[in-house]
C-alpha cells in the first residue's frame, strides 16, 4: 500500500536565487516569483510547510508595465481616518518608492496567513543592481 509523503519543515533546504527585473513585465514576474516563494515548483510541494526558495530581485525600478497602466493603474491606501483615502497612479508609486510596485504585486499573490507572512520574508527586492546577499552565493534565475 502506497502512502502520500509529506515534507516536514526540518527537511526543507532553501536555495538562494537572484532575478534581474530589468525589462520584465510586472505581472508575469510577480506570478513566477510568488510560485517560487511558495515552493510550488517542487514535485513534493506541501501546502502547509514553508518550502519556497529565497528570492533576491534586483533592478526593480526598471520593471515594465504594459499598455497605459503607468497612468491608469491606481493604488489605494486608507489611513483609517474619515477622508483619509489616498489614490496614486503607478507612475507616482514608481517615483516615490520603486520597489513598492513589485512587492505589492507579489504580496497579493501569496496567501494572507501566518505561513504567507513567513513566505513573504523570503523576498528581497532592491532598486539597483547591487544587493548585500553575495555571501549566500545566489544562483541566477531566468524568468520564463
From Swiss-Prot:
UniProt keyword Transport present: no
Example GO molecular function: mRNA binding
InterPro entries hit by this protein: Ribosomal_uL13, Ribosomal_uL13_bac-type, Ribosomal_uL13_sf
Pfam families from the UniProt entry: Ribosomal_L13
Biological process annotations from GO: negative regulation of translation; translation
Tagged with keyword Ribonucleoprotein: yes
UniProt superkingdom: Bacteria
Entries under SUPFAM superfamilies matching the protein: Ribosomal protein L13
GO cellular component terms, A-Z: cytosolic large ribosomal subunit
Record keywords: Ribonucleoprotein, Ribosomal protein
NCBIfam families: rplM_bact
Family assignment from sequence similarity: Belongs to the universal ribosomal protein uL13 family.
Subunit structure: Part of the 50S ribosomal subunit.
Role description: This protein is one of the early assembly proteins of the 50S ribosomal subunit, although it is not seen to bind rRNA by itself. It is important during the early stages of 50S assembly.
The protein's name in its UniProt record: Large ribosomal subunit protein uL13
Gene responsible for this protein: rplM
Amino acid at each position: 500500500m502506497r502512502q502520500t509523503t509529506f515534507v516536514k519543515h526540518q527537511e526543507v533546504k532553501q536555495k538562494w536565487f537572484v532575478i534581474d527585473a530589468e525589462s520584465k513585465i510586472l505581472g508575469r514576474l510577480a506570478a513566477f516569483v510568488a510560485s517560487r516563494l511558495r515552493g510550488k515548483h517542487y514535485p513534493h510541494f506541501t501546502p502547509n510547510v514553508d518550502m519556497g526558495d529565497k528570492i533576491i530581485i534586483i533592478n526593480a525600478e526598471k520593471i515594465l508595465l504594459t499598455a497605459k497602466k503607468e497612468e491608469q493603474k491606481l493604488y489605494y491606501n486608507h489611513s483609517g481616518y474619515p477622508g483619509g483615502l489616498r489614490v496614486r497612479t503607478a507612475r507616482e508609486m514608481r517615483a516615490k518608492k520603486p520597489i513598492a510596485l513589485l512587492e505589492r504585486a507579489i504580496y497579493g499573490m501569496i496567501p494572507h496567513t501566518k505561513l504567507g507572512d513567513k513566505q513573504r520574508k523570503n523576498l528581497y527586492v532592491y532598486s539597483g543592481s547591487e544587493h548585500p546577499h553575495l555571501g549566500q552565493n545566489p544562483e541566477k534565475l531566468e524568468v520564463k
